[in-house]
Amino acid sequence: MVAYAYVAQYPSEVDRIVLMDAFLPGVGDWKTVWLLRDLWHFHFYGETPLKLVAGRERIYFEHFWNDFAADPKHSVPEADRQFYARSYAQPGAMRAGFEVFRNFEQDAKDFAQFAETKLTMPMLVLTGEKASGEFLIEQARLVDTNVEGVVIKGKGHWLMEEAPSQVIPQLVAFINKSQ
């Protein structure tokens, strides 16, 4: 989302863009995703959620690491889980994370406006079959005329952790392509 927001505002500063398994609020049928019951965390922000999660960051994130992976055994490694839990336990970290979701409605307004002017640069969209699947690729085609979409079969949201041997070559090949 951050990459799209940047490139939509400053397209002359970017040669190409990669989106990985995060939908674009305000583009196409975005509310279908935004309102999915399983994605309740999009609406979980403010003081009460902060108090509920404080001191329980690891428990909160375990749900996402496990349930958003195609196979929890090949999701985020234990050392990384410990690092993220420690990091998000720092003052202000969870609030900052929750604010991403609080701002979805404003992002939707901004992205809808950005989408009125289609990008023309090469865009690679990598998404997990058991996560966004074709949805993100379809969204990308609404905002860019030069989209290459790849659905990583049998994988979920954590593409770098679940399928590095598939993702890294895709990234390298895309980055090294000449326009």
Q: What do these predicted ranges mean?
A:
Residues K155-I168:
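Catalytic histidine-centered segment of alpha/beta-hydrolase-like enzymes
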Residues Y4-V151, M160, V172-Q179:
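Flexible "cap/lid" subdomain of the alpha/beta-hydrolase fold that forms the substrate-access gate
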Residues M1:
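Ligand/cofactor pocket segment of small-molecule handling proteins
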